[in-house]
């Protein structure tokens, strides 16, 4: 993990600006940059037929930070990828419980969905705010990206499902259920998706048509979770009736029912790497891992003191499973390491038993605990696609990021997330006043990030300020003002009728003779206005009155004559390039700019002018 410098290096709280004003200096923000570790691994690794990694091995010293490797470089060492270090806590200015957290497919941003129906986008490297938008009218309960990374679907408490493009352009909305939707999942081909609702049913929809194809009925109570196997035509669902069911999506038939829990099922999830296991969690303080080949549970995950609310598999290590509890605790399990506490004996795994069909499931305790990860229930967990950062969303309205500790970082086990605020304050690893000050600084940073947020290029541009209300013309979008009153009709003039006769003849009009040329005025070389006024005085031509109307000509009825010295308003001076850029960087609660508009903007600046 690197650090982004924000301000000077002296540790002061501020300094003098160029104009002598006091300038507040922000502290450094933690930034995770995985580019260096990926490059280091790609540079030093050897081909498969010549052996493995040839670089320096990591050791518990800060000097070995440069030798850190990504999880893909150590697939068989899941213990090195356990996220024990707290990186950052992100929170909105207007706080709501976080129901779902999802990394974007490329891993550059984290998308969170709250009970207010809003999408919030956080930067995946610096964890700062990027944009926010109102996506649903009610609480968002589920999010899922397609396997092709081209689509995002979301479901809310009203039973609606919405289609989104990667730039968060809402394409379609369908009313899938009349009750809240608790979970949804894409099929391996992305041609269909399935929803689980409180009406106790599962529904399979055709993604392209947005129409329901089949309804899966069999649960006796609310369906709380559903998942589609990553490579096979197999569905799994968990319900409030304590049952886990496996379904055939082609025939809508229930294949089998797994009886392993004694309370409401909170999460069911297939393992994505090998696809041979299924993890389930429930409100009975346990989680279970089922082997689909044996159709039985092989691991019983213990250790939680409260109910388990969610779980997630690691994207690289198939034996690393993380769970979140109703009390805000975050536990990490290695399925091949039972890790029993003192006083508990080892149990035999079904794989090692002579009769694997009758032996009970092996009890597994957490390899690492973060008891105080959140203050309230953890509703969602999601791993970065590379597997080096875990994001958690909680009922305490905070989104937190977790990662592995750097070599030599031993104080991570003594922070307030591991031992609590009181114990950490007693040991001097956390200050209550400093914690409040840090929270205020984080909120201030998020407010400043909102000011620098992404811009919606499709938003209407504001009118030119400074123009008064001209009759018959709009006011250019001035705040708080409407359009001007249209001018009254002129008596005797109808739509399409002839213009009224003038009360006096004007030279050159109505067949009259043109005005005589002014003496000393060359028609081929017009003079400047000052010279023209001087010639008009010498020729005896009367100057126009201050009202800018010829003598005898009255203004139209209903419009007062302009006062003396009246002139058109001076247009505002053109904005500089810097001011125009600042005016454009105004936060709008709207979708992200489209890629096409962004490309045009870059091309106008002289970038990306040629195809690559």
Swiss-Prot record:
UniProt cross-references to Pfam families, sorted A to Z: WD40 (PF00400)
**Which InterPro entries does the annotation name?**
Pfs2-like, WD40/YVTN_repeat-like_dom_sf, WD40_repeat_dom_sf, WD40_rpt
Q: Which Gene3D superfamilies match?
A: YVTN repeat-like/Quinoprotein amine dehydrogenase
- Compositionally biased residues, Basic and acidic residues: 430-442
Name the source's superkingdom. Eukaryota
Identify the stretches annotated as WD repeats.
93-132, 135-175, 177-215, 218-257, 260-300, 303-345, 373-412
Q: Does the keyword Repeat apply?
A: yes
Q: Where in the cell is it found?
A: Nucleus
What PROSITE patterns does this protein's entry cite? WD_REPEATS_2 (PS50082), WD_REPEATS_REGION (PS50294)
* PANTHER family xrefs: PRE-MRNA 3' END PROCESSING PROTEIN WDR33 (PTHR22836:SF0), WD40 REPEAT PROTEIN (PTHR22836)
Protein name as annotated: Polyadenylation factor subunit 2
């Amino acid at each position: 993990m690197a650090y982004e410098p924000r301000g000077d290096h002296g540790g002061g709280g501020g300094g003098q600006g160029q104009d002598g004003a006091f300038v507040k200096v922000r502290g450094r923000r933690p930034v995770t940059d995985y580019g260096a570790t990926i490059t280091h691994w790609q540079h030093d690794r050897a081909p498969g037929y010549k052996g493995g990694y040839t670089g320096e091995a990591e050791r518990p010293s800060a000097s070995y930070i440069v030798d850190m490797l990504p999880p893909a470089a150590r697939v068989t060492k899941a213990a090195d990828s356990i996220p024990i270090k707290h990186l950052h806590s992100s929170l909105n200015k207007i706080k709501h419980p976080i129901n779902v957290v999802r990394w974007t497919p490329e891993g550059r941003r984290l998308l969170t969905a709250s009970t207010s129906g809003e999408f919030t986008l956080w930067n995946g490297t610096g964890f700062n705010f990027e944009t926010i938008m109102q996506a649903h009218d009610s609480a968002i309960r589920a999010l899922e990206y397609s396997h092709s990374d081209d689509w995002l679907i979301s479901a809310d408490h009203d039973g609606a499902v919405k289609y989104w493009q990667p730039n968060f352009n809402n394409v379609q909305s369908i009313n899938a259920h009349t009750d809240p939707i608790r979970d949804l999942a894409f099929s391996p081909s992305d041609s269909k998706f399935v929803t689980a609702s409180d009406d106790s049913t599962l529904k399979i929809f055709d993604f392209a048509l947005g129409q329901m194809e089949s309804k899966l009925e069999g649960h006796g109570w609310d369906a709380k979770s559903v998942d589609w196997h990553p490579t096979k035509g197999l569905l799994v669902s968990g319900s409030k009736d304590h049952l886990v069911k496996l379904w055939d999506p082609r025939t809508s038939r229930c294949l089998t029912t797994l009886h392993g829990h004694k309370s409401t099922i909170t999460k069911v999830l297939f393992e994505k790497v090998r696809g041979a296991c299924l993890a389930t969690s429930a409100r009975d303080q346990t989680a279970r891992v089922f082997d689909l080949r044996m159709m039985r549970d092989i691991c019983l995950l213990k250790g939680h003191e409260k109910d388990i609310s969610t779980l997630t598999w690691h994207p690289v290590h198939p034996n690393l499973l993380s769970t979140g509890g109703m009390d805000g605790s975050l536990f990490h399990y290695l399925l091949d390491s039972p890790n029993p506490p003192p006083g508990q004996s080892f149990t035999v795994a079904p794989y090692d038993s002579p009769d694997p069909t009758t032996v009970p499931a092996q009890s597994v305790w957490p390899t690492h605990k973060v008891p105080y990860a959140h203050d309230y229930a953890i509703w969602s967990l999601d791993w970065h696609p590379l597997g080096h950062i875990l994001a958690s969303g909680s009922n305490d309205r905070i989104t937190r990021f977790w990662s592995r500790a750097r070599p030599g970082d031993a104080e991570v086990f003594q922070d307030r997330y591991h031992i609590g605020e009181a114990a950490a304050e007693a040991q001097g690893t956390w200050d209550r006043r400093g914690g409040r000050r840090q929270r205020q600084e984080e909120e201030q940073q998020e407010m400043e990030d909102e000011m620098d947020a992404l811009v919606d290029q499709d938003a209407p541009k504001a009118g030119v300020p400074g123009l008064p209300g001209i009759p018959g013309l709009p006011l250019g979008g001035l705040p708080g003002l409407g359009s001007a009153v249209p001018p009254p009709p002129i008596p005797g003039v109808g739509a399409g009728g002839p213009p009224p006769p003038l009360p006096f003849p004007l030279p050159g009009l109505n067949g009259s003779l043109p005005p005589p040329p002014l003496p000393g005025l060359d028609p081929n070389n017009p003079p400047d206005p000052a010279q023209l006024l001087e010639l008009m005085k010498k020729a005896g031509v009367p100057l126009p009155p201050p009202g800018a109307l010829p003598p005898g000509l009255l203004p139209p009825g209903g419009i007062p004559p302009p006062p003396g010295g009246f002139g058109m308003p001076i247009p505002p001076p053109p904005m500089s390039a810097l001011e125009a850029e600042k005016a454009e960087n105004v936060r709008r609660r709207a979708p992200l700019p489209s890629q096409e508009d962004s490309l045009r903007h870059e091309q106008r600046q002289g970038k990306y002018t040629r195809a690559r």
